[in-house]
Amino acid sequence: MNKKDETNTVTDEVINDNIIYEDYGNIFLDDFVDCWPREASRGVIQFSDGDILVFFKERIGQYKLPGGGKENNETPEQTFIREAYEETGYMIKNIRKIGVVKDQTQTSHIFIAEPYGEAQEIHPDGDEIKFDAKCLKRNPVDVLKNMKKFIIEHKGDSDESSLIQSYFTQRDCKILEYVLDHNLLA
């Protein structure tokens, strides 16, 4: 899509706020009204060999892109840097904003970056602990296939937790498809 988002909050520079994906469908997050809508940042962190970092929830077999919600007065870029470190253990560099994903629950600022240095221990919290989350280095095409498989396997699920995880996987799948389709990785 070539629509432009009117909000531009990363530093004072003009950045790419290309809307990658919009979904305002009626979903199942009524219990979360107090914390939505929220602002978040997420993205693709790619090594020089082409592999990317993903956050893997082993207990349910879910791959997700590193990212999460904005805290306090963070800029979207600061949020991505913090979340990337928390979920992957890596510091990141060469950070490029490529657009936004909007849905009824949040606006996610989408970035591409490179890891540097040695990975530190990750610090999962909440659902991340519950689902035995860990960081993996994987081929992006394989990650996309696994995301699509997860969506198909959970298509008929009716419990709220599975629906939420499937919805988040669909969002990340759209982001990764966009990145791969537009040759945005090195």
Q: What do these predicted ranges mean?
A:
Residues 2-42, 48:
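Acidic, metal-coordinating catalytic segment for phosphate/diphosphate chemistry
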Residues 45-48, 113-115:
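Active-site beta-strand termini and strand-to-loop segments that position acidic
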Residues 36-38, 47, 105-106, 128:
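A generic fold-level signal
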Residues 47-86:
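Conserved Nudix-box catalytic region and its N-terminal flanking loop in Nudix hydrolases
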Residues 153-186:
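Charged phosphate-binding loop/patch that engages nucleotide di/tri-phosphates or the phosphate backbone
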Residues 70-93, 101-155, 186:
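Unchanged
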Residues 38-40, 60, 65, 106-108:
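Short connector loops at helix/strand junctions that flank enzyme active sites
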